[in-house]
From Swiss-Prot:
Protein name (record): UPF0182 protein Glov_0814
GO CC, alphabetical: extracellular region; plasma membrane
UniProt xrefs under Pfam families: UPF0182
Membrane topology: Multi-pass membrane protein
Taxonomic path: Bacteria, Pseudomonadati, Thermodesulfobacteriota, Desulfuromonadia, Geobacterales
Amino acid sequence: MFKNRLTPILFALFIIVPALTYLLAYYTDWLFFVETGFASVFTTKLYAQTGIGVLFGGLLFAFLVPNLLYANRAEFPHAGEYIEAGAIRLQRNQTLPMIRPIGVLIAAGIALFVGQFGALQWENVLLFINRVSVGTTDPVIGKDIGFYLFSLPLLEILRGYLNFMLLATLLVTLLVYYIRGGIALTLRGLLIAQQVRRHTAILLALFSCVIAAGFYLEGFGLLYGNKGAFYGAGYVDVNVRLTTLTTLAFITPVAGLLLAFGLWKGTWRLVLLPPIVVVAAYMIGMRGYPALLQKFKVAPNELALETPYIEHNINFTRFGYDLKKIETVPFDVDTRLSAAEIANNDATIKNIRLWDHAPLLKTYSQLQQIRTYYKFFDVDNDRYMVNGQYSQVMLSPRELSYADLPSKNWINERLIFTHGNGITMGPVSRISKEGLPEFYIKDIPAVSLADIKVTRPEIYFGELSNDYVIVKTRVPEFSYPTATGNINTTYNGKGGVAVDSLLKKALFAAHFRTEKIVLSSDITSESRILYNRNISKRVKKLAPFLRFDADPYMVVDDKGKLKWIIDAYTHSYRLPYSKPLKGGINYMRNSVKAVVDAYDGAVDFYISDPDDVLLKVYAKIFPALFKPMAAMPDGLKTHVRYSHQFLQVQAAMFSTYHMTDPKVFYNKENLWEIPVLGEKQMEPYYTIMKLPGEKKEEYILLLPFSPSKRDNLAAWLTARCDGENYGKIKAYTFPRDRLIYGPKQIDARINQDSYISQQLTLWNQRGSEVIRGSMLVIPIEKSLLYVQPLFLAADKSGLPELRRVIVAFGDEVVMEETLELALQRIFGGKRPAAATATQSTAPDAKALPSTLAKEAMSLYERAINMQRQGNWSGYGEELRKLEQVLKQLAK
């Protein structure tokens, strides 16, 4: 009685419940894809997964079961009464009737497992079906690169699938034969019946063909090898190993047939000899002889013999990371830079980023978080036209942090607190007298101090929006707090899925594991449920075959709406001769810009690199998913920028693969590296500047290089971001016969400056935390300017204030309260007052003597007051300013 009840319970527990959960997840995913307008993407993937899964599982089942049933029909009159296996002893007559049902059940289980594996290969199958020709062939075997990107992965999967199918069939049939008595271990040895031998012979002959196919495919794998000095197939691979594998691909089926013939006839010598020959040939041709050839011929003449293969590695790595488009131009540094030239590059100076991301995030959090349940997760860098000026800005969205809600309950977390509110935006270089950032946009509701307006400040979809919410309910949503009380709002967007039936309520309740969705009286037929709100997970759900940047950035479009832009990358592990990254990727393109509306969650994927061969195939598979870049609204195009992450990858490769001469490459004569400050590599940084030979400033991404194991500069790499110039990259190389200071050398000079080191020591002794910001190398005309901000905080949790700016040029290193004053000390002259700060500036070089005398007296009096107060750092500062004024008077 108990067993009869237990069976349906176990069936429900292990079969029905998981199946329903699986179907429920598919249903909610389907509604999500319909909501975002990409239902065809969902169905394409679903049909592919289903079809491939059924095909893989069905073929295995159709092959395994007939073999099993054939083996089960065999009769062996001399079989013993018992089946013995170690301590197990079963009566044969009672066991034989169970073979068929249990065997079929086992076959079904294996087929189900293989079907699930097959369903996971949907992407490789669709890439193969929609493959395109790249137009470039590999230099060794002569296959089009498209074969490696789109065909080879599937062929290797099929090889593994056939191997598994034949081995599983062989093991299952041998087990059946053993149970039926066709295989027996006796005192005379192992006895195998004739039918068993012949059946096994056929399976092994088929298996040898699959092994031969494996040898054939292994030949293509040689093109991914690591030779130490370079990547790809080398001299020994091409002249020995490739020939060996080709030979093995032909002789293995012959060996398999001989083995099968020997097994069929019961000639054991013929059974053992063929596999021994194949293994011996493999060991000699793939291990022994290549090692000897490498040691005695190649190693002594490596450069001469490996030069063509090194050249292949250079060419294909440059293709794999799109390095071929990088234009290398000489940059002849001039250490003479006048005040007039500084003035001519006023826009560059105004846009030097003084505010570092980490201190600014901390400052924004303390000044603009407004309430504890709001959070600034990240600070983004972008450019806008601000009051008619092309300006670089720092921007951070004010998101809702559910972890910091004062009262955590389902109504608060799901119905009332549904979204973040607005952004904080400010210039990259301007500071108040207190050392704090200035703002273009601040507060809740948003107060705009520039001509940038935010008309839709609500953030329902963001980096911190990890859970579902339900909007348009009877409960008003919290919008923002005021001095007189909270302001409420009601969602008015098209995002989310309508919860307009009891069935949908029940399904969502089951999916999110809460009965409150069904029981809540606040949810109406007009209510909508917003889920998959985390923007990174949202786009990954829609396009799982793309890799997405870990740092989405928010923009304000020309209509005042908040949009997220996320860089997306196509990638492959299969480009021959290309050096791989740590994770194995050896082909990468930033081909897609994903845009997510922060209010309604609408997603668009724009093609930023139409020449990417991988994206061409994905666009064939999912034609409704991608839009051309021309379709992007102009209000968003002006905020598209070259990917920070992709330039990092390109720079890491270009540091070696800018050397296109195989001899120079082999000897590493001109190897570069990304400069290291402290224990951290410098990262690319955005800035606005006028590139050499250009007439106006533009938004660029910049990164310097140093020669390997040296601290001076070798080059600087820049990627352009604006308009038609988007994606153009240049490497400006410095003369190799001259010393150009690198960031680490400038850092050492800063530390050796007695005045600066004294000031830093004084601040640290007073308990303040000194935070040294990022050092920026800013090219101006034909010169280089080095800028590093200094932040002071009362303690580790204190408010960081930008208190000093260090500027280095040539042999001079100065530290002043503002960038303006530092530049005046080095170059003299008077720059526009609004350049970097709202603080007082140094006297004009052309001021009247009477004005300078009054300024000198004022500085002297302030210095005396500082001395009386014991403020020695302030005293030193005033004396330095007095010295500056006296020098002006002397002129």
